[in-house]
Regions:
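Eukaryotic scaffold repeat domains enriched in small/polar residues
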Residues: 1-165
Length: 165
């Protein structure tokens, strides 16, 4: 992951004008103990650590193209979702990242990456998750992630246990 403290330019006017403002969808968590705000953006390849005044302290970027690619009509050429789901505890923030085009017919046959940060914004670890998860939570005491998966053939939904966190 690349760490940045600078926000690159993005054409927000085009986004507002074309109705593509959904690309600013963000998962936001705050810690009263560390006075930090941690955000994971759905359509930008960023996880941001800010202070309570909104000042950017640190930014993680995991890929080469952090900004959504929009044409002049505000249409996204590739519907790439970065932070798909997230979860926080008193100790850590977890961001389940996808980073692949959601328009692919097999999008839910691919795995995901779980990023674990402490409340000071330090990278703790990352984990490969072999399935596409539709929801999750973490049992930190037992080191287990519980994830919601689907089975296309049977049309069923189940909870899968991932140990070793």
């Amino acid at each position: 992951a690349k760490v940045q403290n600078k926000i690159p330019y993005f054409n927000s006017e085009l986004v507002i004008k074309t109705g593509a403002s959904f690309i600013f969808d963000t998962h936001v968590y705050v810690s009263a103990l560390s006075n930090k705000i941690i955000t994971g953006m759905s359509f930008f390849d960023y996880i941001n650590i800010l202070n309570r005044n909104g000042e950017l302290l640190k930014r993680y970027q995991f890929g080469e193209t952090p900004l959504p690619q929009l044409d002049d009509k505000g249409t996204i050429s590739k519907y790439i979702v970065y932070t798909h789901l997230s979860y926080s505890s008193p100790n850590y923030c977890y961001f389940l990242r996808y980073g692949t085009d959601m328009n692919r017919p097999d999008f839910d046959d691919t795995g995901m990456t779980l990023i674990k940060l402490d409340w000071n914004g330090n990278f703790v670890d990352s984990y490969s998750i072999e399935h596409f998860l539709y929801g999750f939570c973490v049992d930190e005491q037992n080191g287990v992630l519980y994830g919601v998966i689907t089975n296309r053939e049977t049309g069923t939904v189940s909870i899968r246990e991932y140990k070793g966190l």
